[in-house]
Each structure stands twice: as structure tokens, then as C-alpha cells.
């Protein structure tokens, strides 16, 4: 079984494209995806060749919000209090909304919960 990266990115003509790529989960945000997205935003913000950042989703959904399966696993381990999703998501949303470059949410389908907050 091969795994797909949770994010795809490319830069074309000054436009940085970031695609949420967890199609089977409707692009739900788990902690690794949140952290990787934050790192990509930092890199694109620092890149002088990038003039604008576009965030979109693969498949039929833009983003289903939090990955509730990951939340359930943390709760089953008794680790929900230290799980850190809310803090990690808040840091990402703050970064997304404070970029020095214009950002565009290319909403290609459902945007729910934290997926809607990215807009």
C-alpha cells in the first residue's frame, strides 16, 4: 500500500499552490498536515519569487475541518488533554491570516469547521 502526501505544492509564475491531499478523509486536518502546512506557508512567505499563495483541496471537498478519527484515537489513549490539535490549528490559522503575501482560498467543495476558518 502506498501513501499519498497530505499536501501537494508547486510554484508557477509567482503563484504558490498548496493542495490539501487527503481525499479519502475529505482533506480533514490532522496534526502532521497542520504542521506541514505551517512550514509551507513560512517557506512561501520567505520566497521572493512567490507573490501570492493559493490554498485548495483535492477531490470533491475543500476541507472537512479537524480529523475526528485522530481526535478519537487521542481520546482512546487518554491523551485528549495533551493532544494539541487546537493549539496547532490556532497557530496555523494565525499564520495563514498574517502572511505578508495575499492568500486565496480556492474552495472547490465542502468547507466545514476549521476548513471554513482557513477562508
Feature names for model-found ranges:
Residues 1-58, 80, 94:
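Conserved CoA-thioester-binding segment of acyl-CoA-metabolizing enzymes
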Residues 57-95, 111:
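Glycine- (often His-adjacent) and acidic-residue-rich active-site loop
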Amino acid at each position: 500500500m502506498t501513501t499519498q502526501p497530505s499536501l501537494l505544492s508547486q510554484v508557477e509564475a509567482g503563484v504558490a499552490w498548496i493542495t490539501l491531499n487527503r481525499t479519502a478523509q475529505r482533506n480533514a486536518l490532522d496534526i502532521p498536515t497542520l504542521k506541514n502546512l505551517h512550514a509551507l506557508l513560512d517557506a512561501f512567505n520567505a520566497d521572493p519569487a512567490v507573490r501570492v499563495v493559493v490554498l485548495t483541496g483535492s477531490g470533491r471537498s475543500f476541507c472537512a475541518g479537524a480529523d475526528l478519527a485522530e481526535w478519537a484515537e487521542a481520546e482512546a489513549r487518554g491523551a485528549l488533554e495533551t493532544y494539541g490539535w487546537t493549539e496547532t490549528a490556532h497557530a496555523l490559522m494565525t499564520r495563514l491570516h498574517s502572511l505578508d503575501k495575499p492568500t486565496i482560498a480556492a474552495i472547490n467543495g465542502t468547507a466545514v469547521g476549521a476548513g471554513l476558518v482557513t477562508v
